[in-house]
Every structure is written in structure tokens, then in C-alpha cells.
Amino acid sequence: MTAYLRPALSLALLMTLVTGALYPLAVTGIAQVAFPNQANGSLVRDAQGQVRGSALIAQDFQGDGWFHSRPSAGAYATVASGASNLSPSNPALAERVKGDAATLYQAQQGPVPQALLTTSGSGLDPHLPPEALAYQIPRVAAARQLPVERLQALLEQATLHPLIGPPVVNVLALNQALEKLAIVR
């Protein structure tokens, strides 16, 4: 029996060492050398070097002077990320969407873009379609006393055109550009 047990335990120990320590350390080392920004969470820093967030995770921007992200089912917390799992026929979902639509419609004119009313699958999508952000321009322009045309140009500069899929804008990057614009002013 020892003849069978010893090789099995040796292999289990070896594979534990390789797959549990050596391989993860090797991949981490390669990632740190080849892709240091992505390996460390795609952190976004301000001019003073302070971390402002991650380019991969949405944030809850408050106040009329900022572009707002789409709603989050998990309160923008990475631990609670995920969809609300409420069906389209669920009254709680209908009430939340109606409340959000009423709030947004009071501040603007015209129909509210769907992206401002619906959560993403992860609840943390940092991107919005340009139309959803263009809808917010009058509110942000009024709060910051900036010309609408300047914010439209800023939005155009921040719009990403991926190879596959529609154009998107990273809301954190757009708000950082907005912050820099206020400093320059």
C-alpha cells in the first residue's frame, strides 16, 4: 500500500506547489512587468497622484456639477456587484425606474435615455453611451456655468470607438477631464 500512497501524495504535494504557488507567482510577475497598470487594477490618479478610482469600476457621482453613471444594483460596491435579478414584471423594478425617470425628466427635457434608468449586468459598468451623457450636459453646464458647446466638445473627446460595439464613454475619465477644465478656467 505504501508503494501506491507515496507517489500519490508526492504528486498531490507537487501539484499543490506548482498550481497553488509557482504558477500564480509566475503569472503575477509577468503581468507586473508586461501590464503593470492593468495588473494593479487600472487605477486612475489625479494630478497630485491620489487614486481617484478604477477605470474598470463605476462610481457614484453626486451633485449637479458631475456626469452621473448608470444606476447600480449593488450600490457601486465591488463586493455586492451583480444585477438586481428583478424581472421586468417586478413592481419594485418598475417603481425604481419610474422614480429615476421622474427625477431625471424634471431636470431635463425630452425622453430619458434607457442607460440612465437600467443597471448593467455587473452593476459596476463604468461606461455609458454618449447619448446618455449628452442628456446630462444641460444640467452639468448650468451647475458649472460652462457653455454647453464646451461640454459637448469634451464629451466628443472622451468618446471611445471600440472595434466591436457602439461608442462608449468612461464616466470617471469624463469627470476627470471636467475637473481639469475647471482648474484651467
Swiss-Prot record:
One of its GO terms (molecular function) is P-type potassium transmembrane transporter activity. It is a single-pass membrane protein. InterPro entries: KdpC. It is found in: Cell inner membrane. GO terms for cellular component: plasma membrane. The keyword Transmembrane applies. Its main location: membrane. The keyword Membrane applies. Keywords: ATP-binding, Cell inner membrane, Cell membrane, Ion transport, Membrane, Nucleotide-binding, Potassium, Potassium transport, Transmembrane, Transmembrane helix, Transport. The chain crosses the membrane at residues 11-31. It comes from the Bacteria. NCBIfam families: kdpC, PRK00315.1. Part of the high-affinity ATP-driven potassium transport (or Kdp) system, which catalyzes the hydrolysis of ATP coupled with the electrogenic transport of potassium into the cytoplasm. This subunit acts as a catalytic chaperone that increases the ATP-binding affinity of the ATP-hydrolyzing subunit KdpB by the formation of a transient KdpB/KdpC/ATP ternary complex. The system is composed of three essential subunits: KdpA, KdpB and KdpC. Belongs to the KdpC family. This is Potassium-transporting ATPase KdpC subunit.
